[in-house]
Amino acid sequence: MMTCVLFLLAAVSAAGAAEPFKAQYTPDVAARPQVRGAMLSQYTVGDDDFRTLKEWGATVVRYQMYPVGERWKGKTSDTDGFAAWLDWKLGVLKGEALPLARTHGIQLVVDMHVPPGGRGGSGMKMLDDPVWADFFVDCWRKIATRLRGERGIYAYDLINEPTQFGKPKVCDYLEIQCRAAAAIREIDGTTPVIVSCRNDVAWCAPSAFRWMKPIDLVNIYYQFHMYEPFDYTHQKVLPLFKDTVAAYPDAAKGWDAEGLRRIVAPVREFERRYGARIFVGEFSAVAYAKGCDKWIADVGAMLNEYGWDWCYHAFREWPGWSVEHVVTEGDSAATAKFATSNDNPRMRALLSVLKGN
């Protein structure tokens, strides 16, 4: 059985000096160019969706997977039901999404968007319950087995925004991902596996990389989400910011391109220290936020400069994130009204960075 080591390994060189741990990548993965794209709602798998994304310049999509709809209601907290949903969902992925993605030259990141067992207790049930922990690992064994050898799979994204509060009873957010990654490697030795930082603030914020540890397996990517400054990107979206009105840039607050670099500095340091590849699974600012087009442009340009893979949040999901919509009235998630648009400042900003600018 393959095991996974989280702590820093000290290799010994021929001279006897300790060498720092470095992430290992197979030559084909090490040679990969940067990919750019968007989060794809699991409801959005039509030919027009992939064609549009390709026209925009996307080369990857982050494909959400979680039980939704009347048929699968409540199955997140039922192992048999979750397993049945996963079998069905993998059929949809292989039979519909992957063929369309291949047709349009787009690769898929397979995203476990909601953890089996749901959230609660220490943050995720599987962190406190060994049955759910084992089940989560078994789910990834199933996914790797069903998708092994399928052309067009860019990576396996183990958990979306893993939440943990306090000390779990079974394993922590990183240990459970380590176990799943090792299980995948027993089946598939090379497809990259994406490990996420802890979702302790701002939906997997860059600051969480201060506590991230590298994993001693080949082809591991490390993920954060970029919703910073959080009170700007989520103003009047979350109850915490129900009265917030903020603009970007804001020199007085240090909210500008250089400020964004300071925010992601922990990730940059991790990348340099361990030679790690970075995946930015989501970034966005709500459509009614003043200056959000400039924020998209600055974040995208920074990610392109650093060569980090990224997916914008989101494509054809909620209009507040969609660049195919504009706000016609209102200034909050509760009051905003939207109209479709095929040309607006936010769209132009995203299309520019999708093309590498």
Give the role of each language-model region:
Residues 71-74, 117-124, 165-167, 203-205, ...:
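Extracytoplasmic/secreted cell-surface and envelope-processing proteins
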Residues 6-9, 15-60, 71-80, 107, ...:
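Non-catalytic accessory regions flanking glycosidase/transglycosidase catalytic cores in CAZymes
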Residues 20-21, 35, 42, 138-141, ...:
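Extracellular glycoside hydrolase catalytic/binding regions
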Residues 46-117, 135, 174-188, 292-305:
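Aromatic-lined substrate-binding rim segments of carbohydrate-active enzymes
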Residues 39, 60-62, 109, 157, ...:
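Conserved beta-strand positions in the central sheet of alpha/beta enzyme cores
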